[in-house]
Amino acid sequence: MRWIKVMAGLLPMIGSKGADEKDSSQQRRLSRVVVPEHYDLHVKILDAGFCGSVGIRVMISQDVSEIVLNAKELEIRDAGIVVEGARIPGRVVVGEAEKELEVVRIVFPSSLRAGPGYLTMEFCGDYSNGLVGLYKSGGPKEVYSTHFEPTDARRAFPCFDQPDMKATFKISIDAGSKFTVLANTQAIPSLREEYGDRKIEYFEETCKMSTYLVAFVVGELSYIEDWSKDGVRLRVYGDSSEVEWGRYGLEVGKRCLEYFSEYFGVGYEFPRAGSAKIDMVGIPNFSSGAMENWGLITFRRESLLYVPGKSNVEDMKNVAGTVCHELGHMWFGNLVTMSWWDDLWLNEGFATWVSFKGMENIGSVVSWDVWGEFVLWNVVRGMVDDGLGKSHQIRMNVTDPGEIGEIFDSISYCKGASVIRMIERYVGESVFMLGIRRYIKEHMYGNGNAMSLWKAIGEEYGEDISEMVEGWISQAGYPVVSVQDCGSSLVLSQSRYSMLGKSDDSLWTIPVVVSWEGKGQERIELRGRETTVRKRSSVYKVNAEYGGFYRVLYDSAGLSGLESRIDSLSVVDRVNVIEDVFGLGFGLYGGLEHGLRRISEYYSDSYHVARSGIEKLLRLRSVFYDDAEIVSLIDKKVRKMILPCVGRIDVFDIGTSVESVSMNKYVLSVGVEVGIREAVEKVQELWRRHVEAGEELGELRWIVYKAVVDENLGYMMDKYKNGDTPGMRREVMNGFSGIKREENFLDVVGNLSQFSVEDIGVVIGSISRGGAFRDAMVEYVVSHGEELYLMVHKNAMLYNMIIMSLRHVSGDLIVEKVERFLSGIKHSGSNLSIEKVRNEIQWRRRMRGIREEVLRGLLPEAEK
């Protein structure tokens, strides 16, 4: 989810060609001369592959001599169309041009007249190796499952595979009798056919939906279930040995579904009231976190299953966030679908934002600072990635599948969600909610776009907001708002922020919210290059509650006032100050030396504040990883900041709340990283007790693994393969960042094929971040690039994870090797990742050019 140059003169705008239609357009989208209305899809699951048949009720709007639809890596035969009761055979054409464009042509002996028809064909295919299309997961018990977003339904059956060609589906699956068979809708027991050791399950007809949401799963599965107050059946499916671990996800799902039904003003009724259901299934091998197939959500196991007493708080947050994200899609994405993939951000950004809305409103099952998490993992991440040179706009014009897969990134998700939050905070929660309800009711079971959404919100707000919002989604980057304190007034001005010193003439309509000490908040629209605001108090904060997606550059008076009140700021406002000071310092806008001197004053024992501050120092440490003096000074500063907290930590009782556990874990992990003896000794004592007396490592598992990996690599590999919790594999891989022995490094990278295909990039990324073998890991990747591409079965998203591991280097020789490697990549779907790596490396080298400023900020006053 996360490939084609058009051969000039060979193919028109892909679609069903009328008799007089010319090959003039070279777009990849199917034409709408023929559109689907309904599919009868039958699939037979076999050991070595699959086969099936599809009948598609279509509407033809003008006379055509052929019908073109999508298919990839399928053998298609016996195609034809029934028109007015007579079947007309068609010739299947799949040449090199069609393969390149992932289509099949059904050519008829004479023109078909405009009107209805029933297109039929049979097909066979092999299971995909790349975790897309219809594929088979390994493990003790094999599971056959689908993953179609964005454009992989065509790997499983011939179809009109684009989001604006919605249709209804009747699905039937032929599989072994021992298997549970699931699809988007409920099975109809009275229609089940059994023969020999096999059965055919028939499923209720779906509502109109896009092909990427079609799904089916076949495997030996057990389930647990619950019902929402509106009568929706929710189930978690998994292996019988672990399905009980789905209780937490099931409870989150039920509560979130009930909240969303109320928030959106439309109940969940897929496919219809009385038979509505949501199945959530943990899949053994899965490329992303989850997939929002309507009525049948598929998950990576650790994103759905939580083991009380053994899983950690990160697992809990991951399960809650992922379940709420996918349920948000049931309305935003499924009920109303973007017309084309250029509005993908509307699906993913909205689902990301609304998942936090859901977590905030479902009671005690979520007991952490939801919006503090949102700021750290969405606003901060989105700003870092969007501030690095050649980013891309939120709404990005895409045509081929490779481009579509690339925009499942932090811009679509994190920046998209942050912009939505900014709009909601500006127009108000209730107005925004009413606008969302209006949008959904106007476009139910159809397609929408961003302009339709802004129109609906504007009608509730009483003012057109489209002009304000369009700048945020149609141009890359974001602004820095400079604040000049003129005594009785403030002058606010804007320019584009860049970490690479590449500004331009971009302008945004910025919904600025200023918090005045003792005077409340004021909303201001900064439309042009600058505006003047009457000053209401001497202390103020621009971008109240970190609600806007922009940085703020204060002059000395403004920043001094904020720093004098730093302890009274909310968590997100305090994080905002840290992020702005260092974000601007990292962009060479000035103030980095000041920020480094004051970082200890910005710091607090709040998890989100502490993490924000320390991460800035660790990011600098990563830039200067081969500079012993800088690394030593950063470690010294970090040790001084966190030592009191480390001293209070009891590794056998790590905390009583999610906040305290998160804080203590983070500080302890950093303490081990920067060599605090007490932190190392505490972790080693926990490991000793684990080995000698079976003490559970619990929340500290990955931190312990990182500390002891060199002496216990075999143990960790066993835990990777036979872990006690679904999340343990991730903890083992995180622990690889602690490898310091060359023989262990060579053992891991020399045997990457022993890891699941979706984990190979994670392992490489962990080692490349670790420091000891950063350059060596990068050397390995650039020397084995093609081998790694084949190892992940040419899955662009998984290969891009490997490419992104190259961004952590700065030295001249290794950077030259990385650039040669990047220049030689010819695989489609990696252009954005390549640019991100280049931009990150360019920024790192730019930062190394201000070493003296960094040194001045780190040195104690007496040593300057």
UniProtKB/Swiss-Prot annotation:
Binds 1 zinc ion per subunit. One of its GO terms (cellular component) is extracellular space. It holds the Pfam family Peptidase_M1. The record marks 413 as: Transition state stabilizer. GO terms for molecular function: metalloaminopeptidase activity; peptide binding; zinc ion binding. Its EC number is 3.4.11.-. Zn(2+) binds at residues 325, 329, 348. Its cofactor is Zn(2+). GO terms for biological process: peptide catabolic process; proteolysis. The active site is at 326 (proton acceptor). Substrate binds at residues 149, 289-293. CDD domains: M1_APN-Q_like (cd09601). Belongs to the peptidase M1 family. This is Probable M1 family aminopeptidase 1. It comes from Encephalitozoon cuniculi (strain GB-M1). The lineage of its organism: Eukaryota, Fungi, Fungi incertae sedis, Microsporidia, Unikaryonidae.
